[in-house]
Amino acid sequence: MARQLDYPTVREIFTRFQAAEPEPKGELEHVNAFTLLVAVALSAQATDAGVNKATRALFAVADSPAKMLVLGEEALTEHIRTIGLFRTKAKNVMKLSRILAEEFGGEVPSSRAALQSLPGVGRKTANVVLNMWFHYPAQAVDTHIFRIGNRTGIAPGKTVEAVESALEDHVPAEFALHAHHWLILHGRYTCVARKPKCPACLI
C-alpha cells in the first residue's frame, strides 16, 4: 500500500484527468433514476457490458417500479439470466420495485440511508446513484478504485470504507463530482490489475 500523496500531487493528478476527459460518463446504460438503480444493483460481480446487453430489452418494457411489478419475477429472471447471481438479483429488484411503488410514490429516493434500505442496495450502489443521478459528490469505491487508491497513493486504505474516506478527505472539491468516474475508467483501461499500461498513464 502506497503512502498518501500530498494535496498538490493529488490536485495535479485530477487536473490531468480533467484535461483528458472533461465530462467522464459511467458506462451503465439507463434512462431514468430507476433504471440506473436497477442497472447498478445488477452490476455487482458482473461487467457493465454484460449488464447493458441484458437491460436494453428489459428497460424497453420495464423502466419504472410499476412496470417492473407488472413484468413479474419470472420474466425479469429470463431477461437477466446472463448476469451472475441472476436469481438473487431478480428477487431483490422485484422487492425494491414494490417498496419504491408502495412507500416512495414510484420515485427513487435521494438520500443514502433511504437507498441503502432497499433490498440489494449497498453503500457502493447508493453512492453511484447519488453521484450519477443526483449529482452528489459521493465516492463509490469498486475494485478498480480500491486498487488505484492503494497502488498510486491517491487514497490508500485497507478497506473500502477507508479508501472512500481518503477520497473524501483528499480530492479537491472541484474534482469531487467526477473523481469516481475518472478513477474507474483509469482502472478499467489503463491501471489494470495485471500488466498495468504504465507508459500510457497520465499519472
Give names to the regions the model predicted.
Residues 2-203:
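Catalytic cores of DNA base-excision repair glycosylases
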